[in-house]
Amino acid sequence: MTSVVVVGTQWGDEGKGKITDFLSANAEVIARYQGGDNAGHTIVIDGTKYKLHLIPSGIFFPEKISVIGNGVVVNPKSLVKEINYLHDSGVTTDNLRISDRAHVILPYHIKLDQLQEESKGENKIGTTNKGIGPAYMDKAARVGIRIADLLDKEIFAERLRTNLAEKNRLFEKMYESTPIEFDEIFEEYYAYGQEIKKYVTDTSVILNDALDQGKRVLFEGAQGVMLDIDQGTYPFVTSSNPVAGGVTIGSGVGPSKIDKVVGVCKAYTSRVGDGPFPTELHDEIGDRIREIGKEYGTTTGRPRRVGWFDSVVMRHSRRVSGITNLSLNSIDVLSGLGTLKICVAYDLDGERIDHYPASLEQLKRCKPIYEEMPGWSEDITGVRSLDELPEAARNYVRRISELVGVRISTFSVGPGREQTNILESVWSAK
């Protein structure tokens, strides 16, 4: 048995989809365990770019099982659209499995998400307005509708009527907005349920059986550790647990069955939406990194905020997610910069701190303490081993590993599969 979890170690958009796709070549089952279609990952295969939001990256391997676990919140409309997109691209989805325990995102969740965000004014969180938060709220309040409910016409109708009555009171009384009618949702979403019915099953059984049979299972996280509702920059976070511990809850697999945790990061830092970002760049260097790195959100299209590599963030991610291996992406984006900076600690009111504060007020006062390193001018997109990197690039990679305290198992010098270089196989024995 070998199981590997892939987690983002920053604020999402670290290149998890690419690394998951790369590691999927040696996996037999690939599973997502949290999040929804607010997550976006881009995969490049033979020069063709594919953008997915819900379906695991492993779908491109027809002989492998791709699982949407119970911890994922599923928008049936988005899922059907994504399935059709794959079919139109010549990709089969016969290997897809969807948990019958996963919760469903419905139009009232999306509307509530938008209204809540608008009402916050300057205190907005920066939500993608996909209904993710309200769906998880309903789940916690025990009024959510699950995939199993969606497939049963009578149960779906009953629970939808009950939920709409409550949500419409909220829309009309609190937000002075128009209600959503039952007929606007019911037939359309029941039909979506019937379209995905053939994929629905108890995915916990599939995953545990695979592990018990000694198969290789890969768990794919969405977003990143710094967006985790418990360990991230609360309240500027997502509504689920991207940390590796989220696997046990969101997939129905016990913690004793997790072998390795691969933390994915960029050679710099990026963030979409609001919230603290100590190493953020507001100058021409930041603009250059954004343009060369194509730092625009897969889901929203919004320009991402960019900054220098932050080892304080990375050490926090290592601790709370139990990271055993590091996958370092986008090193090539830094080519051509004369001097590079790595944040090694923060200055908080004159005191050096090495940990990431929970207090947003303290974070606002934190100033990054930088270590400068020489850059490199060479084009490294064709590099296929660590030894081929310029000396300055090698030193930069090694310094990141030292500061984070985790060995690097892969590094990437571009978006293609062939541009991902293995230093150590995570599929080897413990």
Swiss-Prot record:
Active site feature: D13 (proton acceptor), H41 (proton donor)
Reactions the enzyme catalyzes: IMP + L-aspartate + GTP = N(6)-(1,2-dicarboxyethyl)-AMP + GDP + phosphate + 2 H(+)
Cofactor note: Binds 1 Mg(2+) ion per subunit.
GO molecular function, one term: GTP binding
Cellular compartment(s): Cytoplasm
Positions annotated to bind substrate: T298, T299, T300, G301, R302, P303, R304
GO terms under cellular component: cytoplasm
Cofactor(s) for this UniProt protein: Mg(2+)
GO biological process, one term: IMP metabolic process
Positions bound to GTP: 12-18, 40-42, 304, 330-332, 412-414
Gene3D superfamilies, sorted: Adenylosuccinate Synthetase, subunit A, domain 1, Adenylosuccinate Synthetase, subunit A, domain 2, Adenylosuccinate Synthetase, subunit A, domain 3
Annotated metabolic or biological route of this protein: Purine metabolism; AMP biosynthesis via de novo pathway; AMP from IMP: step 1/2
Binding of Mg(2+), residues: D13, G40
Subunit record text: Homodimer.
Assigned protein family: Belongs to the adenylosuccinate synthetase family.
Protein name per Swiss-Prot or TrEMBL: Adenylosuccinate synthetase
Organism: Streptococcus suis (strain 98HAH33)
Highest classification ranks of the organism: Bacteria, Bacillati, Bacillota, Bacilli, Lactobacillales
